[in-house]
């Protein structure tokens, strides 16, 4: 794409009747990295602000005794607060991990609170259409990392619910957090391969656009850093992009200052692939915590019942504790997920300045 024409090529992101003036989704980041402060600020700029529901109520009173209740309360609170900050601009959504134990409750709370979009990954969201009626106003999207996964979820939704995705998020191998790839794939996948995967997914969804008589926008995620990356995604046929890591080093991000500084200080060689108790590889910053996990299992002192498939007696560490420690500012002894380009982040900015730089 000719960068001189870049601005004229940036179209609004239209998800049915819901419209974001800027085709940028701020990716959901948990625990507590993207809540109402960040999501509301992104929506206010005309983008799609996304709240992560993973242990979102970690700082609510009584969380240690009642995680489910605190999380439900916090989902409502943060969606409403983000919408207030947005002032009627952009869209406010949630990212809900399929691996969560209270997945259905998180979806229902998000719909009731008025989320515009529900994005769901860390597993295939097979039952999402059953939890979100077509008339409720919330739009649904699976996160997929392969054409195979896209075909599978679209086929299942069509067969089981006579319904299709409102949009699709394609998350590539350069993303942060949990990744839909094997360790081997992450070591050997070059960009050319993945561009082809994106093109195949775009072709695959065409069948369902025809069947259901509607456009299914595609949003590309993973390693999107600057205008050139956005232009490249649009050239491949995407309708928008999802960016997460870059929004961490903003004043509005909901993480502690120490967490944001860890991103600013990070170098390319500090990034590594780890195995998560969720059962997927993840990309994170190497620190004391990761070195300790490599040496020995970190016994789980308290189980937060956060994951559907987790045996606290066997997992290498408690992911809830590790992520909460990090978001609160203990950046050496907590888990800091990040995208592959975190080493390119050099300074603190604001959501407004970052979006101006990207558009």
Across the structure, where does each feature detected by a protein language model lie?
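Active-site entrance/lid segments in N-terminal catalytic domains of soluble metabolic enzymes
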Residues: 2-211
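Residue-level detector of alpha-helix initiation sites
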Residues: 33, 224-225
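Conserved active-site-proximal phosphate/metal-binding subdomains
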Residues: 25, 175-219, 225-359
């Amino acid at each position: 794409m000719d960068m001189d024409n870049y601005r004229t090529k940036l179209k609004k992101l239209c998800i049915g009747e819901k419209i974001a003036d800027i085709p940028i989704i701020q990716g959901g980041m948990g625990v507590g990295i993207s809540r109402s402060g960040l999501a509301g600020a992104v929506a206010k700029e005309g983008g799609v602000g996304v709240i992560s529901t993973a242990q979102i109520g970690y700082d609510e009173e009584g969380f240690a005794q009642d995680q489910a209740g605190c999380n439900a309360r916090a989902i409502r609170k943060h969606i409403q607060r983000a919408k207030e900050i947005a002032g009627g601009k952009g869209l406010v959504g949630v990212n809900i991990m399929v691996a969560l134990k209270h997945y259905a409750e998180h979806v229902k709370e998000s719909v009731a609170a008025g989320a515009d979009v529900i994005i769901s990954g860390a597993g295939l969201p097979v039952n999402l259409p059953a939890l979100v009626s077509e008339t409720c106003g919330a739009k649904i999207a699976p996160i997929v990392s392969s054409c195979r996964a896209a075909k599978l979820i679209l086929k299942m939704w069509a067969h089981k619910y006579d319904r299709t995705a409102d949009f699709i998020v394609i998350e590539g191998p350069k993303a942060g957090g949990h990744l839909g790839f094997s360790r081997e794939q992450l070591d050997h996948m070059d960009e050319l391969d993945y561009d082809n995967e994106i093109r195949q997914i775009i072709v695959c969804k065409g069948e369902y656009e025809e069947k259901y008589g509607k456009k299914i926008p595609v949003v590309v995620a993973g390693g999107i850093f600057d205008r050139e990356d956005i232009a490249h995604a649009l050239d491949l046929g995407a309708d928008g992009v999802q960016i997460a890591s870059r929004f961490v080093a903003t004043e509005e991000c909901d993480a502690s200052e120490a967490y944001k500084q860890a991103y600013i200080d990070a170098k390319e060689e500090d990034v590594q692939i780890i195995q998560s108790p969720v059962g997927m590889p993840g990309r994170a910053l190497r620190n004391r915590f990761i070195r300790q996990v490599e040496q020995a299992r970190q016994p789980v002192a308290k189980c937060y019942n956060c994951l559907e498939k987790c045996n606290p007696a066997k997992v290498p560490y408690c992911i809830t504790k590790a992520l909460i420690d990090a978001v609160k500012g203990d950046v050496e002894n907590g888990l800091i997920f990040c995208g592959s380009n975190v080493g390119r982040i050099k300074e603190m900015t604001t959501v407004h300045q970052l979006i101006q730089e990207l558009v």
